[in-house]
Swiss-Prot record:
Pfam families for the chain: ATP-synt_ab (PF00006), ATP-synt_ab_C (PF00306), ATP-synt_ab_N (PF02874)
Annotated ATP binding sites: G174, D175, R176, K177, T178, G179, K180, T181
Protein name: ATP synthase subunit alpha
GO cellular component: plasma membrane; proton-transporting ATP synthase complex
Function: Produces ATP from ADP in the presence of a proton gradient across the membrane. The alpha chain is a regulatory subunit.
HAMAP family the record matches: ATP_synth_alpha_bact (MF_01346)
Positions bearing the site annotation: Required for activity: S375
Enzyme class: translocase
Organism: Cutibacterium acnes (strain DSM 16379 / KPA171202)
Location, primary (coarse class): membrane
TM region positions: none
CDD domains: ATP-synt_F1_alpha_C, ATP-synt_F1_alpha_N, F1-ATPase_alpha_CD
Gene Ontology MF terms: ADP binding; ATP binding; proton-transporting ATP synthase activity, rotational mechanism
Keyword line: ATP synthesis, ATP-binding, Cell membrane, CF(1), Hydrogen ion transport, Ion transport, Membrane, Nucleotide-binding, Translocase, Transport
Amino acid sequence: MAELTIRPEEIRDALDNFVQNYEPETAVREEVGTVVTSGDGIAHVEGLPSAMANELLRFENGTMGIALNLEERQIGVVVLGDSDGIDEGSTVRGTGEVLSVPVGEGYLGRVVDAMGNPVDGLGEIKGVEGRRALEIQAAGVMDRQEVREPLQTGLKAIDSMIPIGRGQRQLIIGDRKTGKTAIAIDTIINQKGNWESGDPQKQVRCIYVAIGQKGSTVAEVKGALEKAGAMEYTTIVHAPASDPAGFKYIAPYAGSAIGQHWMYQGKHVLIIFDDLTKQAEAYRAMSLLLRRPPGREAYPGDVFYLHSRLLERCAKLSDDLGGGSMTGLPIIETKANDVSAFIPTNVISITDGQIFLQSDLFNANQRPAVDVGISVSRVGGAAQIKAMKSVAGTLKISLAQYRDMQAFAMFASDLDDTSRRQLDRGARLMELLKQGQFSPYPVEEQVISVWGGTTGKFDDVPVGDVLRFEGDVLEYLRSHSNVLTTIRETGKFDDEAKDAAAAAFEEVKKGFKTSDGKMLAGHEEFSPMADEDIDQAKIVRAKKG
C-alpha cells in the first residue's frame, strides 16, 4: 500500500490558483421563484428553496410580501399591497432581509402606515436613526426590573383603584362604544405636563396604533391630540380597515419596534394597540387562506403567540440597560360583555391586569364606565405615589359594599341609618368618579377629591352638585393654598396638608349654593329680623309665660 504523503507546496499552489481565478458574481446564485396561485392577498410560490421564515420577497411588479408558510414544495406569501400584476407565472425574488421599519425622533408628531411610511402629507420623515426589525426578541428576565413608577392616566377611577405603572401591560376591554379609545386618548393627553417639564425621566413618548379603524376615526383622534397639544410627543401608526390583512397583522409590531428603539435608549414610552381583536381577525383570515389548521373559533393554533410575543416587549428595563420602559395598553372589543371568549381570555392571561368597561354603566352616564368589581391591576399600590395609596385604600371596598347594598335596597323598604349613610356616600363616590372626555386630572387634584369622598366631605352635598362642588374646592386650593404643590413635589399627603384641605372644604361650603339655589345644611344665611317682628316675638313669648 502506497504511503500517503502530504505536500504543502501542492496545497498552497491549489489555493493560490483558486484565489486568482475566483469570480464573485459566479459564486452567488440568485434564486428566482414563480407564482403558482394568487388571490385574496395570498400568493403561493415555487422555486425559492433558501427562503427564510418572515423573509421579505419582491414580486415582479415591485410589491413586497412576507414568507409565512415554508412548505416542502411551496411558500405561502402574504402580499403587502395591491395584488394586481401578481399573476400565475410571474417571478418572485428573495431579498435576504426580514421586515423592518425606520425608527427615530423624527417619528414624533407624524402619522405613518404599517411599513413606517408617512401618510400625513407632511413630507419625508427627518431624524431617522436607523431601522429595527419587527420580529425582535423581548427583553429577558434578568434584563428587567419590577414595575414601581406610576404612569398617570389622569382618570380618577383608574389612578385611584386600578393604577398603571411604567412597563406594565394593562388591558382595556369592553363592548363597542363604551369609551375604550377615550381612556387611551385621555392617558396620552395627560402626559403633556411631563413632556413640557423637559425632564427625560418624566417625559413619555406615546404611540397610538390604529388597527382596522375607519379613516374618519383616526382623523378624529389626531384632531383631538392636536387640539390638546399632545401630538408633538405622539406617533400614530395607521392600518385602516381598507388595507389588506397583512398590514393589519404587522401594524402592532411596527409600532412596538418604534417604541423599543426609544426604550433601549433609556426613554419612557406608552403604546396603545386599538384594537388587538382586529389584528387577530386579520391573522385568522390570513391563516385560513394559507390553509393552516383552524382551532377554536377558527383561529389558528398560534394566535396566543401572536399576542404574547407582542405584549412581552413592554417592560421596565434594568438600570444596566438604561432603565427605559414601554407601557402597553392593548384594547380588546367584546361582544355582549363576554370576557370568556377566546381572544379576551388569551390577552387577559398575558397582561398585568384589565380595565373592564361596562355598557350598562356607560348608558347610565357613569363615564368612564369602569366596572370596579372585575377590573384589577396586578401591580397595585407599587405603581402609586404614597399620597394616593394612603387615601384610596378604602375606596374600592367602599364601592363594592355600595353595589351590594344598592342591590339589597331595591327589595328592602326599611333601612337602618348606617346602611342609608353607606348608600348616600356610595352614590356621591360614584358621582365623584365621573369625568368628562379630554379633561384629565393632575394626580394631586385626584388625591384631594378621593380623600374628600372617602372621609365624608361630600356627604352634605346633593349628588347632582358633587362635581361642581369638587371643582370649586380645587379652584380654591389652587389660589389659596400650597397643598397641591406639596403633594405634587413630595408625593405625600401629611396631617398638615389634610388640615389645610379640610379647611378649604369648609370655606367653600360657606358660600356654595346647590342647583336649586339653597345653601348647604349648617351654612344657611340668616337675615336680621325687623323691629316689628322682634316686638311680636316678645309678645308671643310673654303670653306663653
